[in-house]
Amino acid sequence: MAVLTAVDLTNASRYAAHMHRLEFIGRWRERLPHILIDYTLRPASSEDDYYVPPKLRDRALAVKLAFSRRGCDSMSCYPFHETGVVSNQTEFAYTQTSETSVAYSQPACYHLDRAAAMREGAENEVQSAEFTYTPNNQCVLVDSTSKMYFNSPYLRTEEHTIMGVDDVPAFNVRPDPDPLFPERFKGEFNEAYCRRFGRDLMNGGCSFRWWESLIGFVLGDTIYVTFKMMANNIFSELRDFDYTAPSPLLPARPVADSNAVLAQWRAVRDRAVDWNFEKQFSEAPTLQQLGLLADNGGLMQLAYTAETGFAKTPIAYSARVTPRAVRDFGAPGRQLNDEELEAIIASFLEEYSLVFGIATDIGFDMLLTAFKTMLKKINTALIPALKRMLVSTSQRVTVRLLGETYKAAIVHSMNRIAIKTLTTAAKALTRIAIKASSVVGIVLILFTLADLVLALWDPFGYSNMFPREFPDDLSRTFLTAYFETLDANSSREIIEFLPEFFSDVVETDDDATFQSLFHLLDYVAALEVNSDGQMLHFTESNAIEDFDEATLVGQALASSSLYTRLEFMQYTFRQNTLLEMNKNNNRFNGAIASLFLTGTAVALAAFMLHKKLTFFVYFAIFLMLALYYLVKEPYEYFKTIDLLF
């Protein structure tokens, strides 16, 4: 019997992802109704999305889910105040370290899941990041590191001993209006900052007036600046420097009612939602029920915009559903004699273990270990969910159909893990959590940025700090480092954040896995021909109504241990080499032990005849040496094993 190919398993995972995304809309509405979302529904295309089996032509969808403009603003979280990072007890407020006030500790920082935020150890684990909404209708992650550097001078250093770096007013910070760089923040000089260094704000930079330049030429810039700073009481201000109000020239900090802000954030609702229509999303709706089929038989795309409503546009697919041609009825290379579910699962896992056996041979031991651990965790959760799905479904499920569904579920689980751990978005969230953990963490990340501040100016000479181009150069440097620290090999693409990146707030992994199994089963059952053109004939297998969950988990874990013949040969080679080396190192142990045993017997006889203590001492020494050489070989073997393993 033919089985699903890698292409089929990938298509099944894509189908399940789109259908799960459709159901996810309703779950998001229930859990986070105040975070508004947009979505687009259209019939799936075999060319652009995934292969659509003929049996699914009336319900296969491509679903796109994104934050609306207001939803993106509601999800934004800036986690730094003047002197540190926010915690789960920090209330919403503003900083006023420059002429522009900056809000921090927005409700999204710790109120997406308040119960999780209040658990021990989660005090500094922010639940969101800082975003901006672009003209292209994307919720984009911004470079909060540069914003923090511009706005919170205290966080620039750890020891706070470098004069003129952290004991200064902040730069005015604002988002870059350039649509090509929505992630970027721009810094600007202000009068308070220039005054701190004995200069005046002129043409966007900090400069001397023309007559001050003449005086500085005669006295020297350093001497003139010192007298000017004394006259402006700068030194007295530095003795009692307040990082929250670094200059008397700055406006007062805005007063914020954090409780009112939180209540307003929670009270937001999308009045344009059609609840009766969206209720269908969890009931496997057809294209006709969703209104994606026009009266003339054409296909439609349905786009929902929060607080506005629906908009339909016609779309055209050429040959949207083309049945696969049957090329090979026999499929001799893909047969299983034993149709037991355990055999199907074990065969699948062992087949993939060969691939990772090769990876081990060329040096990917860490990859193999991580894959083993991941596979065990997946199987431990997946097989119980598979049984729940089998009991809950109303369709006839055969052994082979369930086995192929299991394979697709493994691939789908790995795709989900990859999204959460390997994507640029996941890396970005991880960095936000690290930066929000401590001030030390912030400084460490600053020191790892490429071409950081010290590459641009000398903090003690102040030679390049005051031209109006300096903040722009600094901003560009941070933006470059922002991309390079996320992924040195990635393209400079905008990092869009989607609601599904926050699925942990809405649903558990077990629930997501269980719901996805039904979609995977539907897709696998609808396939009649695999991507190689082989007939599948899943219905010809025996029906299955239940299975021993514990036994199958054990069978899967044993199969996924990836203990291949290659590993066995490597293990036996190491053991044989160790035994041979140990034997060579202890080649004369037997002869030496025999000599000491002979000496022991002679010393014992002499002691019994002459009753002298000297002979007894010889007897004891010879006996201990003989025993040592008798146990020396096994002792060294097990000692080496303990060190190696």
Swiss-Prot record:
Keyword line: Viral occlusion body, Virulence
Cited Pfam families: Baculo_p74, Baculo_p74_N
GO cellular component terms, A-Z: viral occlusion body
Disulfide bonding pattern of the chain: none
GO BP: viral life cycle
Family label: Belongs to the baculoviridae p74 family.
Function of the molecule: Essential for virulence of baculovirus occlusion bodies for insect larvae.
Protein name from the UniProt record: Protein p74
Species for this entry: Choristoneura fumiferana nuclear polyhedrosis virus (CfMNPV)
Gene giving rise to this polypeptide: P74
